[in-house]
Amino acid sequence: MKAEYGEIKDNYGEIRLFPESIDDLWHLQHLVSPGDLVFATTFRSVEGATDKIRPEKVEKRPVRLGVRVEKVEFSHHGVRLRISGIIEHGMDTGAYHTINVETGYEISVIRRWRPVDLERLDRAVKASVYGVIHILTLEEGEAELFRLRQYGPESVITITAGSGKGGETETRTGFFDTVIKSIAEVSGPMVIAGPGFVKEDFVRYAKNKNCAPAGRAIVAETRRIGRGAVQDVIGAGTLEKLIGDLQLSREVRLMDEVLLRISRDGAIAYGYKDVATAIEYGAVDEVLLADSLLRDRAIVPLIESAERMQAKIIVLSTEFEPGERLAALGGIAALLRYKMG
């Protein structure tokens, strides 16, 4: 994400945003809310004749519009963000319009920027400096490649011994060759993980085949493969050896701490009522919030109160297991400075 800050006074103002990836579009989904004013260049129909019954020509021209947001929808598969609302600035004022935001498309957002919004924006901007991380999970006869999005792992391909055409994966070397083909185009950081010694055998074989991604990969031990192995890798801090601090690593560690404190009846609060009470007493150190609650009208004043108490706000993606666990606890939890009675 690229961002250009305009004039911001008392946390209210304009920021120009340039999404560069699907991760950036996902961030925008949580940065743009109903009530915001969004400016963008879009296309509107312009009639080429004064005859309104049978115009000679109807063409679409680029125009800059300001839309008061009513709805925001993000599509992983369509790789776009739909921002819908009423036109307040530009042609056809009062009409309903949808801005389709794709990568490389500039928008300007005017709103009140909370600290949690600016933290997310800063994270999106910093994330653009390193390549997308891939994690290959591997055991005997089975492999799965994941692309690590900022909202969680995305499965790219699954390979099983004996599943290829012509039996090319029937043998161990044939299976390894198929896996090598699947990672050949990976250009960014990579981790190869799994239980046992198969991953080491694969890396040695792949290096002998001059497979560049395997040559620069970090090898990690996990108890399992698949999505569970990805969480093991993230939770162990392996990715921080590649790129430094990573939000997903922090999410795993924080939720582990939440569950540990719950099991020990420690300094923890979860669920709206208990967290609200803890904030009221100034006992909160960190608040964990599921991203699905960011626009909840009851949650917004609660988060604002926590920020006034100097508590840290960490938003967890519900598309990744730690966020799913948090959602099961009511979508909000707080690590406390001391245990409350």
From Swiss-Prot:
GO terms assigned for molecular function: endonuclease activity; metal ion binding
Entry's EC annotation: 3.1.-.-
Transport recorded as keyword: no
InterPro entries to which the protein is assigned, alphabetical: eFR1_2_sf, eRF1_1_Pelota, eRF1_3, Pelota/DOM34_N, Pelota_arc, Ribosomal_eL30-like_sf, Transl-rel_pelota
Alphabetized UniProt keyword annotations: Cytoplasm, Endonuclease, Hydrolase, Metal-binding, Nuclease
Any one Gene Ontology BP term: nuclear-transcribed mRNA catabolic process, non-stop decay
Cofactor: a divalent metal cation
One cellular component (GO) term of this entry: cytoplasm
Entry's localization field: Cytoplasm
Gene3D superfamilies (alphabetical): 3.30.1330.30, eRF1 domain 2, Pelota, domain A
Family: Belongs to the eukaryotic release factor 1 family. Pelota subfamily.
Domain comment quoted from the record: The N-terminal domain has the RNA-binding Sm fold. It harbors the endoribonuclease activity.
NCBIfam families: pelota
HAMAP family with a match to the protein in the record: PelO
Quaternary state and interactors: Monomer.
Stated role: May function in recognizing stalled ribosomes, interact with stem-loop structures in stalled mRNA molecules, and effect endonucleolytic cleavage of the mRNA. May play a role in the release non-functional ribosomes and degradation of damaged mRNAs. Has endoribonuclease activity.
Protein name: Protein pelota homolog
